[in-house]
Amino acid sequence: MRFTQIVAAALCLGATEAAVAPIDRARKVLGNQHAFDKRDASGDTAKAPKHLTSKNKKFYVDPNSIPGVPFDIGESYAGNLANTPAGNSSLFFWYFPSENPEAKNEITIWLNGGPGCSSMIGLLQENGPFLWQPGTDGPVKNPYAWSKLTNMVWVDQPAGTGFSPGPPTVKDEIDVANQFSDFWKNFMDTFDLHHSDVYLAGESYAGQYIPYIASGMLDRKDSEYFNVQGITIIDPSIGATEVIIDAPSVPALHRFNNIIDLNETFVNDITKKWESCGYKKFMDDALKFPPAGPMTVPGKSAGCDVWDEIIAAVKEVNPCFNIYHLRDNCPSPSNVMNGPKNFFNNKQIQEAIHAHPTDYRLCGESQIFGPHRNDRSVPSSYGPLASVIERTNNTIIAHGDLDFLLFTEGSLASIQNMTWGGLQGFQKEPSDKFYVPYKDGSEVGGAGFVGKTHRERGLTWVTVDLAGHEIPQYAPTAAYRMLEYMLGRVQSLTETH
């Protein structure tokens, strides 16, 4: 190009706009501060505890004593309470009373799954008063802490999990429910919470734990200790593995292969195998509204572990693929809960929260349910879940769409094969839009239309588009809204005002 042409081109450009660096354009729109940088890590003036008594003082946690946390975490109590009448075993808890006046006569229990995974990860990385999440450089206050709404307790259970010393003794979910109920009675006595409304929430294998625990509590017909008013189970394990993992895995692969990026030959081959294993017919039948009738679950056959084959192929393409959040790529973010030097495997922290000295692991190798980790109880959707829905009229099953271990369609298929309130499954396909209001702080959690929701006969179904396995971690505002709904603070998940 001649010099005169270059000058002419420059003059032409100057008539419209000068060259602008793309990063300057981005800064103008987005600002210089990452949304997560807006979260508060400043110190506070400690407040006098309002709930301290002679019965619970040994569990009181100094709010400024947690190593590495540079601010007051608020009033809390932690330690172990017996989970058997004989007192020869115990469960660890961390309890945060709420300052919300509407929480006066209620308490919500949070359980993580596994089996054998500590609920402290829920506290530290999902919905606790302070968070240290993967890829972040330190603890911050959580603007969407569930303790802002209700009295919250995170519990390591069953025995042998996290800070709850073993050996594990449970063989099935009836044992789990009995063990937890014995602990719960001690907890309610210790903190004078008698006659409180009790809510249970959790994720993953807590989809097995919680319906059995709630059912066991309701069976006792004792409102002084066990006044269960509702449950929420997130990305739950509620059905046979063929239903919640294998059958929905290939449809999910087709849906998300623009992200997962497996080649056409593999996708075609695994789809043919999925069809020959009977999974296609099952899913076609399961996702009809209303369902035509009870569905036979395909049995586990040789060569039909299609999810396993998909994951093996995905790992070749993306070595850092995260089954809990399918959009993750390399490098994997650092995580303070991983490895032997994890946050809770610290003598000073263990002393601060009155935990027994423990070589703490997030998900231990303890033999929950015996040496083969074989839970003898049937999946909760075949067992007590329907009864809990009927008896509480307040059950939420929620699913993050980006989970690639337990699939949205698998949970929905389990619901469609379950009978409650005199009918099988949902009679209408879920289609209402789940709305999260815009408010201060939503820049760190999102707002607007975030998924779908549907309610029939006491069961509310919720999906969250941009969340993985742990909805409170990936979509804290959506999780907070669901909690508001379970507690009765809002009457709808679709209202836009």
Curated annotation (Swiss-Prot):
One of its GO terms (biological process) is proteolysis. It is an enzyme of class 3 (hydrolase). Keywords: Carboxypeptidase, Glycoprotein, Hydrolase, Protease, Secreted, Signal. InterPro entries: AB_hydrolase_fold (IPR029058), Peptidase_S10 (IPR001563), Ser_caboxypep_his_AS (IPR033124), Ser_caboxypep_ser_AS (IPR018202). The active site is at S204, D403, H469. It is found in: Secreted. It comes from the Eukaryota. Pfam families: Peptidase_S10. Its EC number is 3.4.16.5. GO terms for molecular function: serine-type carboxypeptidase activity. GO terms for cellular component: extracellular region. Transmembrane segments: none annotated. PROSITE patterns: CARBOXYPEPT_SER_HIS, CARBOXYPEPT_SER_SER. Belongs to the peptidase S10 family. This is Carboxypeptidase Y homolog ARB_02032. It comes from Arthroderma benhamiae (strain ATCC MYA-4681 / CBS 112371) (Trichophyton mentagrophytes).
